[in-house]
Amino acid sequence: KSDARLRFMDPQYGFVTPLARFFTVGFTDEKVRGVRMSPQVEPLLLDDTLKVVLDLQDQWRNAGWVPIRVKDFPSLADTPQWRAQLRDVNKGGTVYWRAGDKYQLMLVVSRFRDNKRPTEERYLITLGIHRSRGVQ
């Protein structure tokens, strides 16, 4: 097994993810179409999940990314309301961010049944990045 880390090297909008075990790059006509990854090497406890997500959101905010579609998909936060929503296996959390007219991303947090630790609440984070589609 080998783990990878995304270093998004845009001079203005760059950020770095934690190590990932799941990491895919999509191509069309030999050009990168998008990246999909899970910025973790195993399903995480809720506290650890929030640390990863909040760090990524801080990096994006500091690099000039802005949250979009916030009426329906507000940024994640470490609040009792968000914790309850993430614990609900039928809800989870999704956020969208945009970097000018260049890029968009979607981050999803989902409850995950981990057969290695069946008595623990574990979570998966999925991150997808692609060129901006103009969604505000």
Model-identified regions with their sequence ranges:
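N-terminal leader/targeting segments
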Residues: 1-31
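A generic structural signal for beta-strand entry/edge sites
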Residues: 3, 29-34, 92-94, 122-126
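Generic recognition of long tandem-repeat/solenoid scaffolds
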Residues: 6-9, 13, 95, 125-129
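Short, surface-exposed beta-strand/loop "edge" segments at domain boundaries and coil↔beta transitions
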Residues: 15-17, 42-47, 102-106, 132-136
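Long, charged/polar, surface-exposed segments that mediate recognition or autoinhibition
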Residues: 19-91
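A mature extracytoplasmic/lumenal domain signature
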Residues: 39-41, 71-74, 101, 109-111, ...
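Aromatic/basic-lined ligand-recognition segments
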Residues: 78-116
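C-terminal basic regulatory modules in eukaryotic proteins
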Residues: 106-136
